[in-house]
Every structure is written in structure tokens, then in C-alpha cells.
A protein has these predicted regions:
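Periplasmic solute-binding protein
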Residues: 1-13, 38-60, 140-146, 220-229
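Conserved C-terminal helix/tail region of periplasmic/extracytoplasmic solute-binding proteins
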Residues: 7, 203-254
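Short helix-initiation/N-cap motifs at beta->coil->alpha
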Residues: 15-22, 86-100
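Hydrophobic residues within well-ordered alpha-helices
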Residues: 20, 27, 50-53, 97-102
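Glycine-centered hinge/linker elements that transmit conformational signals in sensory
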Residues: 23-28, 60-88
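Beta->alpha turn/N-cap motifs
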Residues: 38, 92, 109-114
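Paired acidic/hydrophobic, glycine-rich loop segments that form the ligand-binding mouth/hinge
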Residues: 78, 105-110, 126-128
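C-terminal lobe and pocket-closing loops
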Residues: 110-124, 131-226
């Protein structure tokens, strides 16, 4: 968030949905929007909307209701002018550009953007946890370690995968690649744990959710993306978009 914009608007950093709506509205002035997100039809959209779904207290097994609530909230930010309808075409990089160029007071994004912000943002900014609704929740992202079916050296590959996901291996990997770990036992023990801005992301680990929804996840994600497109562009109501998506999602859940 842009610290000066929030200060000029006389508001504090939002901590829940109600205060996020208030802060987004009060920091919206002219062509400057209060909030930018990535809602382009890609995995980025799923990554950004799922925390709102989880924050309702729900999950994909009740997307018709939890998804409707999440989509209605986001659509409400567009309806009151706090967020541009163009977010339906924004990538995460686009959301970052809106923020860096002063066209958005806040954005929802990930730790991978911090290096660019440090380099390019010509203003004082900081990071805060995602505001919550009934509960706190965020998405867990990053790298996946897999062994391909039919691998010639499958035994060795399994050993490597186990090592890379162990505490010792994960620490070496994360410290070398500049990433945070999903392992709770490494929280506060990585090189990046000492960075105050990155620590905000690490501190959300206890309520971070993996997108672990089985082998049909790509189809599930596509249905979520479509529901976002329909709801945020106004092509459908949030309720109808979520209900339609749920009809695809529910039979695919493990």
C-alpha cells in the first residue's frame, strides 16, 4: 500500500473486509483507484480470489455460496468506483504497474513483486496481511517438486524430492533461490525471514491454503476463472456466476 495515499485520506491500513472497502473508497480520487488486483483469465485470478472464498469460512465444496459472497464483495468494489473493471484483464504485473505509477493506492500481490517495488516505486510503501472476513486466509504458491511417471531414475528422483522438501533441503533451496518455505518448522529461520516486508508474508503461513484439489484441479481453476470474468465484467451476477461454476467444480472435487 502507498503510505502517503492512506495518510492523505486519513485512513489506517485495512484489516478486514469492511475496512478494506472503506479505505479503497476513501483513497479513490479521479483516475486513481483504491485497489488493484489481477483477475485476468489465468491461474493468477484463481490465486487471488480463493483467499476471499476461504475468508468467508467456506471452500470449493460450497462455492455456490462462498464463491458468490467473495465475487459479490469484489464486484462491489467495482460498482462503487474503488476498483477498475479493467482488473478483469490485469495480470499481476499490470496490478503492480498500476500501483507503482500511482494509479492505485493498494494492490493484492505476492512477495515476488517486492524487488521490483524496491527498485521502481518512487514513494514510501509497505506490506500488510490480507484483510479477513470470518477468518484469515491466503493462498500458498511457489514451486512444486514432482517425480514424473516413467522417470528412468525414479528411485533417485524420489530421494531428491524427499530431500528438497525436508527441513534441511528446503532451507538450502529457499536461501539459495530467494524464496520462503511452506514448512512451519522453517518459519523465522530463513535468510528472508529477517526482511520486515517479507516477514509479513511468512507470518501468514499458519493460515495459508494450498490449492490441493486433486487431479482435476486445472478444470476446477478454469471454472473459477470464468466465474470471476462473468461477475467482475457484469456479464452475470456474482450469485449466478458462482452457481454455474459450482456445477462444474463439485463433481470434480476429490
Amino acid at each position: 500500500y502507498n503510505k502517503q495515499m492512506l495518510k492523505d485520506a486519513g485512513v489506517e491500513v485495512p484489516t478486514d473486509w469492511a475496512s478494506l472497502k472503506e479505505v479503497a473508497k476513501k483513497t479513490t480520487k479521479g483516475d486513481v483507484k483504491g485497489l488493484a488486483i489481477s483477475a485476468v483469465k489465468s491461474e493468477s485470478a484463481t490465486f487471488q480470489v480463493l483467499p476471499f472464498v476461504w475468508q468467508t469460512g467456506g471452500d470449493l465444496n460450497d462455492y455456490a455460496t462462498s464463491g458468490a459472497t467473495a465475487l459479490a464483495y469484489l464486484r462491489g468494489l467495482i460498482d462503487d468506483g474503488s476498483m477498475s473493471e479493467a482488473v478483469s484483464n490485469y495480470t499481476q504485473e499490470d496490478a503492480r504497474t498500476q500501483f507503482i505509477t500511482g494509479k492505485s493506492a493498494m494492490m493484492i500481490n505476492g512477495p515476488w513483486e517486492l524487488a521490483t517495488l524496491t527498485k521502481d516505486a518512487q514513494f514510501d510503501w509497505d506490506v500488510a496481511p490480507l484483510p479477513q472476513d470470518k477468518r484469515a486466509a491466503t493462498s500458498m504458491g511457489g514451486e512444486n517438486v514432482v517425480v514424473m511417471n516413467g522417470a528412468k531414475q525414479s528411485d533417485a528422483a524420489v530421494k531428491l524430492a524427499k530431500y528438497l522438501t525436508s527441513a534441511e533441503g528446503a532451507k538450502i533451496y529457499c536461501d539459495g533461490s530467494g524464496q520462503l518455505s511452506s514448512r512451519p518448522d522453517l518459519q523465522g529461520k530463513l535468510k528472508l525471514s529477517n526482511d520486515p516486508k517479507l516477514k509479513v508474508f511468512e507470518d501468514q503461513l499458519p493460515y495459508a491454503h494450498a490449492r490441493a484439489y486433486g487431479k482435476d484441479y486445472p478444470k476446477i481453476s478454469e471454472a473459477i476463472q470464468l466465474s470471476m470474468q462473468e461477475a467482475l465484467t457484469g456479464a452475470s451476477t456474482p450469485e449466478a456466476a458462482a452457481k454455474k461454476a459450482a456445477e462444474t467444480i463439485t463433481p470434480l472435487l476429490p
